[in-house]
Regions:
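Gly/Ala-rich beta-loop-alpha elbow adjacent to hydrolase catalytic centers
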Residues: 128-137
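Short beta-strand element of the alpha/beta-hydrolase
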Residues: 65-73
Length: 241
């Protein structure tokens, strides 16, 4: 009888924990702000395909034969990064935002593989991500030699990439109140050796996307659109450098 009673307690606790996890996963997600939604539409130079697995921004011309795969930040809707991806496509870069289960890249860290397989015309692949997305993007880059470089937006690698030979760009923002600077500094030894570091003055954590304010973040002195324009410019200069 005691064993049966203990088993019932264990099952009840497991149910409560599981329910709590699902509530956490489904609650508090950041949806795309209205100003990002225009970027989900086709323009003269970019065609947008929004599917269940991701959002693809295809430029009318891709003189670079380069593709950019992007992993969203934790609990942030993929559409919140449409302006950033559209901006890169305007510069001739095929850009794909990978959608994540529960908006958490840890549940689809290998999503870049199917993107690469679907675009054999692309010769050079760059992967990047915001916050948690950047961590998972770095993990993927360490495992797939088809990746040539990594872009970190308010993020850092947990995997040691120092001897990987990968190109890398680290973009941070001066008013970011979410990025753990202590962990970022500790992770500096894991960045590829020739990583380029650039801080966007006046930007904050949420400004790398368009999804409104984020708890704990600093106030931005520039709008998200300006921060993302700066990010696009820095990414293009780094790619072409």
């Amino acid at each position: 009888m005691k064993k049966k009673h203990l088993l019932k307690i264990i099952i009840a606790v497991a149910i409560v924990i599981t329910a709590a996890m699902f509530i956490y996963l489904l609650a508090g997600n950041h949806t795309a702000a209205d100003e990002a939604l225009w970027a989900l539409s086709d323009t003269d130079g970019v065609t947008v395909a929004n599917t269940g697995s991701g959002i693809t921004f295809t430029p009318a011309e891709n003189p670079h034969s380069t593709g950019f795969i992007f992993y969203p930040g934790g609990k942030v809707d993929a559409e919140a990064y449409a302006q950033l991806a559209h901006g890169l496509a305007d510069e001739g870069i095929l850009s794909v935002i990978v959608k994540m289960p529960f908006d958490l890249a840890v549940f689809n860290s290998g999503g870049a593989g199917s993107v690469i397989d679907a675009h054999p015309e692309i010769k050079t692949w760059i992967i990047g991500g915001h916050s948690l997305g950047g961590v998972m993007a770095a993990d993927y880059a360490a495992k797939d030699d088809r990746i040539s470089g990594v872009v970190f937006l308010a993020s850092y690698p947990n995997t040691d990439l120092s001897a990987s030979g990968l190109k890398a760009l680290s973009l941070t923002a001066s008013n970011d109140g979410v990025l753990n600077r202590g962990k970022y500094d500790e992770a500096l030894r894991f960045f590829p050796r020739d990583t380029i570091f650039y801080e966007i003055e006046g930007g904050n954590h949420a400004g790398f996307g368009s999804y409104g304010a984020q708890d704990g973040d600093g106030g931005a002195a520039i709008p998200p659109a300006k921060q993302q324009e700066t990010a696009v410019r820095q990414i293009m200069e780094w790619m072409q450098g």
